[in-house]
C-alpha cells in the first residue's frame, strides 16, 4: 500500500494561509500576518493590502529598520501615497524612522466608497458656508474626516504598532489631529505640514489656488490628466522648485495605478461637511510641531499658525519660500525638523 498524499480541508486551509503570509524579515512578524511584497513605487519600501474592517482595505507601504520608531504618514486630498517624494521617504528612513505610508480610502489602490442615490451637491456653496461660519452638517456626503481618521486608527491597530508617530500633510494633517485627539494612546508625537483646523473665518486660499479645487481636466484621458496635474502643481507648488519632469512621471504613475476622480470629489466633500476640527485640535496631547511654507497660497500660513495656537504646546515653523508641496530643496531642513522632534530620547 502506498502512502496517501491527500490532505483534508483544514490542513489545506492552514497551508494556504501560511503561503499567503510573507515577511521581508523576521522582525516584520510583529506587524501582523500580512502578505508583504516589493513595492512597485519605491526601492526602499514593501507593500501590502491591509484589511481594517468594514469592507475597507488600505494599500500600505513600509520600509526602514522595523526596530526603529514607526512613523505613519497621512497624505492629503486626492493624493495617492506617491505624493510623498521618494527622496523624502529615504531621508526619513536614514534619520531613524520606520516609515509607513498608505492610500487613504477612495484613492489609489485602497477600497473605493460608492453609495447609491447620493444627490449632487455644490462644493462652492459648501466652501462659502464653511468660510462664513455656517454648518454643512447633514450634507449628503459619503463620509467625513472622522471616518477617515477611524481608518487611520484601525490601520495602526491592524499593524500592531501600539503607539506611533504621525506625519500629516494638508487634509492628512486634519485627519492626524482627529486621530491624536480621539486615540491619544495610539499617538506618541506628531508633525503636521501645511494643514488647518478647517474653522470659519480663516484667511481663504488665494483665488488662483482656490480655482485648483474646482477646476477639472478637459477629459479623463491620460494626456489631459497629466497636463492638468502639471498646471495644478505649478499653481500650488513652490515657485522655482516645481520639477515638471517629475510631476509628469508621478501623474502618469497615478493614472496608470488607479484613476478614480470620484474619490477626490468625495474627499473634498468630507472636508467641507466636517467643518471645524478645532474641538479635536484642542484635545491633542501628543507633542506637536507644525511646518508651513510662507508661499502657500492654497492653505495660507496663517492657518498653520492657528493650528499651532489651538493644539496645546504646539510649535510652529515657518519655512520661507515654500508653498504647498515638498520640494527637494527644502527636504533636508524639513526632515531635520521632523526627526529632531519625533526621535527625542
Where are the model-predicted features located?
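Conserved hydrolase catalytic core segment
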Residues: 162-201
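Alpha/beta-hydrolase
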Residues: 205-279, 286, 306
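Short beta-strand/loop motif that positions the catalytic acidic residue
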Residues: 284, 290-292
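Conserved acidic catalytic loop of the alpha/beta-hydrolase fold
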Residues: 134-135, 139-142, 146-164
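Catalytic active-site module of serine/aspartate enzymes centered on a nucleophile-bearing elbow/loop
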Residues: 314-345
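Acidic catalytic loop of the alpha/beta-hydrolase fold
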Residues: 295-299
Amino acid at each position: 500500500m502506498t502512502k496517501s498524499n491527500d490532505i483534508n480541508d483544514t490542513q489545506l486551509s492552514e497551508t494556504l494561509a501560511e503561503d499567503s503570509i510573507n515577511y521581508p524579515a523576521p522582525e516584520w512578524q510583529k506587524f501582523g500576518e500580512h502578505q508583504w511584497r516589493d513595492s512597485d513605487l519605491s526601492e526602499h519600501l514593501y507593500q501590502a493590502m491591509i484589511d481594517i474592517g468594514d469592507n475597507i482595505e488600505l494599500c500600505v507601504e513600509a520600509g526602514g529598520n522595523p526596530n526603529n520608531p514607526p512613523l505613519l504618514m497621512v497624505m492629503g486630498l486626492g493624493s495617492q501615497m506617491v505624493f510623498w517624494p521618494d527622496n523624502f521617504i529615504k531621508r526619513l528612513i536614514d534619520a531613524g524612522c520606520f516609515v509607513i505610508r498608505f492610500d487613504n480610502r477612495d484613492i489609489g489602490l485602497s477600497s473605493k466608497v460608492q453609495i447609491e442615490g447620493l444627490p449632487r451637491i455644490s462644493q462652492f456653496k459648501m466652501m462659502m458656508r464653511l468660510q462664513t461660519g455656517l454648518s454643512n452638517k447633514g450634507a449628503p456626503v459619503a463620509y467625513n474626516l472622522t471616518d477617515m481618521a477611524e481608518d487611520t486608527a484601525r490601520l495602526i491597530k491592524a499593524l500592531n504598532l501600539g503607539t506611533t508617530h504621525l506625519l500629516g500633510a494638508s487634509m492628512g494633517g486634519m485627519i492626524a489631529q482627529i486621530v491624536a485627539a480621539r486615540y491619544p494612546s495610539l499617538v506618541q508625537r506628531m508633525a503636521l505640514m501645511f494643514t488647518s483646523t478647517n474653522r470659519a473665518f480663516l484667511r481663504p486660499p488665494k483665488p488662483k489656488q482656490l480655482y485648483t479645487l474646482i477646476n477639472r481636466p478637459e477629459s479623463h484621458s491620460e494626456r489631459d490628466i497629466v497636463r492638468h496635474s502639471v498646471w495644478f502643481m505649478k499653481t500650488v507648488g513652490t515657485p522655482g522648485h516645481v520639477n515638471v519632469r517629475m510631476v509628469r512621471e508621478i501623474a502618469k504613475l497615478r493614472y496608470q495605478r488607479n484613476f478614480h476622480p470620484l474619490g477626490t470629489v468625495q474627499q473634498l466633500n468630507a472636508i467641507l461637511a466636517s467643518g471645524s476640527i478645532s474641538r479635536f485640535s484642542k484635545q491633542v496631547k501628543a507633542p506637536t510641531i507644525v511646518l508651513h511654507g510662507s508661499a502657500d497660497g492654497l492653505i495660507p500660513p496663517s492657518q498653520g499658525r492657528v493650528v499651532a495656537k489651538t493644539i496645546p504646546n504646539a510649535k510652529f515653523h515657518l519655512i520661507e519660500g515654500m508653498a504647498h508641496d515638498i520640494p527637494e530643496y527644502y527636504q533636508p531642513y524639513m526632515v531635520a525638523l521632523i526627526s529632531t522632534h519625533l526621535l527625542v530620547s
